[in-house]
Amino acid sequence: MAKLTILIALVAALVLVVHTSAFRSSEQSCKRQLQQVNLRHCENHIDQRIQQQQEEEEDRARKLRGIKHVILRHKSSQESEESEELDQCCEQLNELNSQRCQCRALQQIYESQSEQCEGRQQEQQLEGELEKLPRICGFGPLRRCNINPDEE
């Protein structure tokens, strides 16, 4: 009976070591992938989306105040540029081979972009846009991914 207990303990320890080793290997692989992938297109897309939201809010505020101020925007070229940034962003995120690594990429974008936010509202817009990206890119919501690592 003692031999069986020792054998079970050894097998459990071996499983733990293998699992830990695989996790470390996965983390190292993700770090390498994040160093190789260029997330600039994702950052640009997010910047454009937040700017667009702010412009829409300003337009609504003007309308509520009764100011008839027409803003001429070059929608077609702007939308085309946004679409191109989004397509390239999705390609970059799809290059990452796991949801955990994709989550790390979104967290990395949040960390770099949140420094430029002016207030909590912009941070929330940033979080919201980053949370939408996986669905927009077609690989669904990321499970257990907290975009803002400070809130963990």
Swiss-Prot record:
GO terms for molecular function: nutrient reservoir activity. Residues 1-22 form the signal peptide. One of its GO terms (cellular component) is endoplasmic reticulum. SUPFAM superfamilies: Bifunctional inhibitor/lipid-transfer protein/seed storage 2S albumin. Keywords: Allergen, Disulfide bond, Endoplasmic reticulum, Signal. It comes from the Eukaryota. It is found in: Endoplasmic reticulum. Disulfide bonds join C30-C101, C42-C89, C90-C137, C90-C137, C103-C145. Expressed in developing cotyledons and in the embryonic axis of germinating seeds. Belongs to the 2S seed storage albumins family. PANTHER family: 2S SEED STORAGE PROTEIN 1-RELATED (PTHR35496:SF20). Heterodimer of a small chain and a large chain; disulfide-linked. This is Conglutin delta 1. It comes from Lupinus angustifolius (Narrow-leaved blue lupine). The lineage of its organism: Eukaryota, Viridiplantae, Streptophyta, Embryophyta, Tracheophyta.
